[in-house]
Amino acid sequence: MIKEAIGSLVLGKSLTLEQSASVMDEIMEGKTTPAQIGAFLTALRVKGETAEEIAGLANVMRAKSTRISTSTPVLDIVGIGGDGINTFNISTTAAFVISGAGIKVAKHGNRAASSMCGSADVLEALGIKIDLNAEQVKICIEQIGIGFMFAPVFHPAMKFVAPSRREIGIRTVFNILGPLTNPASAQYQLIGVPEIGLGDKIISALCHMDIKHALVVHGLDGMDEMSISGDSVIWELKDKEIIKFRHTVSPREMGLEQVSLQAVKGGAAEENALTLRAILSGAKGPKRDVVLLNAAAALMVADKIDTIAEGISLAAEIIDNGLALNKLESLIKLSQSLASG
């Protein structure tokens, strides 16, 4: 199938959902060569990925991951990355706030690819054991309401793709598949994208996936998160129907002060870990505000509240009551205990 797919792509022809799924199945089963994988990824990038191609690839990659089955539906909040802005770990900080609201969070992430500090890097710097197996992460999610799935542990079949990706050295569809391939089958998702056009594709791809409620967000300043330095664009999907498309949200409308992008910049893992802990401990300022905004959007996705404005108030209450910090401390303690046997 991969040879036929490459032939179609170089002619500018898009693949169907089923064709792209068949190609990914061959790749994940180790039935393709590195040269074929490199040619496929390059041809797909040059043509430009369609929503159906993205969904077909993502559905198989998720199915081939090491799965986690939870007793209740879970939420994931993640930025695709690649915005080049180097903010602190906004989504990761927000994850503890969301968990503090009683939403089960299955955070799926990796080390930094294009930024200085990925979710895995900052969690490790906080003392969390990031390389837990599926059963151990499930215990974290069920017992304390939040767990972290380190992508290399949960996607062993990516070993077939890694050499080709490294050798061709360009951004490929795999750079955007991570947020769509949560091993716990997150039914609720907030996904940040670095470009508007990518938001259009991702929300359309989610229509072909097993998702109950999702928001795709983009800061018009370039952030792959909701921004407080300018307006943000959101796309919303509920029960496989797109109900918002390129809807604009202003921080001022939400009662938040608009600040420069510099105010939410981050650094290396140790610095970002201190920032995360300070925010969850109640520190005020722009970094708290951007976490409140993104946590609020995720709380709306989880159907905890009806509007983002309502979610901001709830997120602030969760932080100020110490519930978010408690989730962080609990995950540090439990992950270390599980890792030590």
From Swiss-Prot:
Residues annotated to bind Mg(2+) 2: D224, E225
Residues bound to anthranilate 2: R165
Free-text comment on the cofactor: Binds 2 magnesium ions per monomer.
One Pfam assignment: Glycos_trans_3N
Record keywords: Amino-acid biosynthesis, Aromatic amino acid biosynthesis, Glycosyltransferase, Magnesium, Metal-binding, Transferase, Tryptophan biosynthesis
Residues that hold Mg(2+) 1 according to the record: S91, E225
Cofactor annotation: Mg(2+)
Gene3D superfamilies: Nucleoside phosphorylase/phosphoribosyltransferase catalytic domain, Transferase, Pyrimidine Nucleoside Phosphorylase, Chain C
Gene Ontology, cellular component aspect: cytosol
Domain of life: Bacteria
InterPro entries reported for this sequence: Anthranilate_Pribosyl_Tfrase, Glycosyl_Trfase_fam3, Glycosyl_Trfase_fam3_N_dom, Glycosyl_Trfase_fam3_N_dom_sf, Nuc_phospho_transferase
Reactions catalysed, as given in the entry: N-(5-phospho-beta-D-ribosyl)anthranilate + diphosphate = 5-phospho-alpha-D-ribose 1-diphosphate + anthranilate
Pathway it works in: Amino-acid biosynthesis; L-tryptophan biosynthesis; L-tryptophan from chorismate: step 2/5
Quaternary assembly: Homodimer.
NCBIfam families membership: trpD (TIGR01245)
The protein's name in its UniProt record: Anthranilate phosphoribosyltransferase
Naturally occurring in which organism (per UniProt): Dehalococcoides mccartyi (strain ATCC BAA-2266 / KCTC 15142 / 195) (Dehalococcoides ethenogenes (strain 195))
UniProt lineage: Bacteria, Bacillati, Chloroflexota, Dehalococcoidia, Dehalococcoidales
